[in-house]
Amino acid sequence: MSESSYKTSHTAIRKARRFAMQGLYEWLVTDRRFDIDGKLGWKANAPHDIAARTRATNAMHTVHIGYYHEMMRDIPEQIDALDALISQHLDREINKLDTVEHAILLVGAYELQNRLEIPYKVVLDEAMKLNNHFGATDAHKLINAVLDRMAVELRAPEVDADSKANLRTSQKAAAKPVTKADKKTDINANNSDIEEKPIASNKPRISANNASVKRNSVSKALANITDYKASKQNDTQNTVEEIIIKPTSIETVIVDKVDEIAVSAENIANDQPVEENIAASNDKVTAEVELLDSNSANFDTKSAELNDADEKSQD
């Protein structure tokens, strides 16, 4: 598979940077140390051998192979210049650095010096990520400080432009709180006005006032019951009064009936013989009297029932 068919995205570059840091670490603890100590005959782990072995033992189809080989070739060739650049911003000798920190600083210094298309903030951020994966807990302080000083030296125009942009942003941020404070005061004033105004709601309130609501409903029900009883008593009293008044009307009816009987008796006497008239009149009078007796009996029973109903309603 050719190198042009491999990935070249930001993720692929990040993976290439990680593999390069691991390869540089391996080279620093073997051939680079032997070279410093003068044991040249022990050198048997050249950078290109490390790269070939890494490609053979790892899935590199998601790695930017070109960038990986570039760092594995150029950083060992520029090791003396890069170490001198790093040493300018260190507070200790470079040979006292941890090997992992040394490898991360080599990658960062190389990118700051040779890869100007990569923003210096990206270089610092990627160095921090490498330290999070492979470095010590507090090593990020040293790495960040050294690379930041190197960026000021190697990327002066970029750092100045970024600092000016940050200054403008901070000035805008400093001017905003005044308007925000005014808005907050306005909002608080509006909220206080809203709180002062009672807001009607159709939803039932769930609070301690439920007890008073229940008491009011019970009192209303009792009032309705008493009103109903009073109306019933008035109805029964009116009915009794009507029935009590009726005897006068019954008496008038009886008188009218007697008059009618007398008139009919006179008519019968004029039209029929005396004996027949007397018998017919007697029969008619008897029938009318029986009818009146039955009506009076019905009246008595009705009045007694109404009196009983009145007494029960009063109880």
UniProtKB/Swiss-Prot annotation:
Superkingdom classification of source: Bacteria
Transmembrane segments: none
GO-annotated cellular components: cytosol
Segments of skewed composition (Basic and acidic residues): 302-315
Gene Ontology MF terms in the entry: RNA binding
GO annotation (BP), single: transcription antitermination
Keywords for this protein: RNA-binding, Transcription, Transcription antitermination, Transcription regulation
Stated family: Belongs to the NusB family.
Classification via NCBIfam families: nusB (TIGR01951)
PANTHER family with a match to the protein in the record: ANTITERMINATION NUSB DOMAIN-CONTAINING PROTEIN, N UTILIZATION SUBSTANCE PROTEIN B-RELATED
Entry function: Involved in transcription antitermination. Required for transcription of ribosomal RNA (rRNA) genes. Binds specifically to the boxA antiterminator sequence of the ribosomal RNA (rrn) operons.
Protein name: Transcription antitermination protein NusB
